[in-house]
Regions:
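Alpha-helical scaffold elements lining the catalytic groove of polysaccharide deacetylases
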Residues: 56-58, 107-135, 145-191, 203-207
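A short acidic, amphipathic alpha-helical/loop segment
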Residues: 61-62, 87-91, 150-153, 207-211
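C-terminal domain-boundary segment and adjacent tail
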Residues: 19-22, 30-42, 68-70, 83, ...
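Hydrophobic membrane-insertion alpha-helices, especially the h-region
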Residues: 2-17
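Active-site beta->alpha N-cap acidic-glycine motif
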Residues: 21-112, 116-127, 132, 136, ...
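Active-site-proximal beta-strand/loop segments in catalytic clefts of secreted hydrolases
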Residues: 50-52, 77-78, 103-104, 140-144, ...
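Conserved, mostly hydrophobic/aromatic
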Residues: 51, 66, 99-102, 124, ...
Length: 247
């Protein structure tokens, strides 16, 4: 009886945490683990990424704007957000967007022990899997706070830690024009850029249509993280730019 219970427990735990199929990557630069900030790509591609942690009042409009412009993006969700707004999570997945792990409770991962980091990731991973059937593979730590333990723990769970080289700063609530200017005038904006936005920021949905149009006017093709990132055989430079090993 006890053996049966233990076996079932191990099966359940195994279902929660997923392992990478192939580990042939290096996020270590000069002895320090780094998140992916951008991607070396021949084509002028970029990704819009949204963080979803608190409110959901703008998510419907954001998804409609993306659909109207035939754009797919990436949404990083917390476990708490998933529990509160399951229908929005389903809409994200049904819309063809990537969905990523943003922890369970939006705590600062750097301040947590390894076991606590694992718990934060596992809870959200399982919640999304049960709701949508999706196995998430991208992780963005809350507050942009990371260290070697955070990145390596995520990697052990099959996750690529992804930040972004362009921060819209939309959370400062300076207005739609400021968001647009901040992104479009950033000197780091280039092919392979990962753009950070917050779904609950006050002016994000207002800025989004013009942001999409401006990026496309500059020749960018907006894609998902799954379409942009290398899943294996890559390394990072000192800026966290993902470069395939054959270059």
């Amino acid at each position: 009886c006890c053996l049966f219970v233990v076996s079932v427990f191990l099966l359940v735990v195994g279902a929660v945490w997923h392992l990478p199929e192939i580990v042939t990557v290096s996020n270590n630069v000069y002895g320090k683990e780094l998140p992916i900030q951008s991607v070396e790509t021949e084509e002028k591609k970029a990704v819009l990424t949204f963080e979803c942690a608190w409110d959901h009042s703008s998510i419907k409009d954001i998804l409609e704007i993306l659909e109207d412009h035939n754009v797919r993006a990436a949404f990083f969700v917390t476990g708490d957000w998933v529990k509160q707004y399951p229908e929005d999570v389903r809409r994200i997945v049904q819309g063809g967007h990537d969905i990523g792990n943003h922890s369970a409770t939006h705590r600062n991962m750097v301040q947590l022990e390894k076991e606590e980091i694992e718990k934060e990731l596992k809870e959200t991973h399982q919640a999304v899997k049960e709701l949508t059937g999706k196995e998430m593979k991208f992780f963005r730590p809350p507050y942009g706070a990371f260290n070697d333990t955070v990145i390596l723990t995520a990697k052990e769970g099959g996750y690529l830690t992804v930040m972004g080289n362009i921060d819209s700063m939309d959370w400062k609530d300076y207005g739609a024009k400021t968001i647009l200017r901040t992104v479009m005038e950033d000197k780091e904006l280039q092919g392979g850029s990962i753009i950070r936005l917050n779904s609950e920021a006050k002016y994000t949905k207002e800025a989004l249509p013009k942001l999409i149009e401006s990026l496309e006017r500059e020749g960018f093709r907006l894609v998902t993280l799954s379409q942009l990132l290398y899943q294996e055989a890559y390394h990072l430079d000192v800026k966290g730019r993902q470069i395939p090993d054959d270059r």
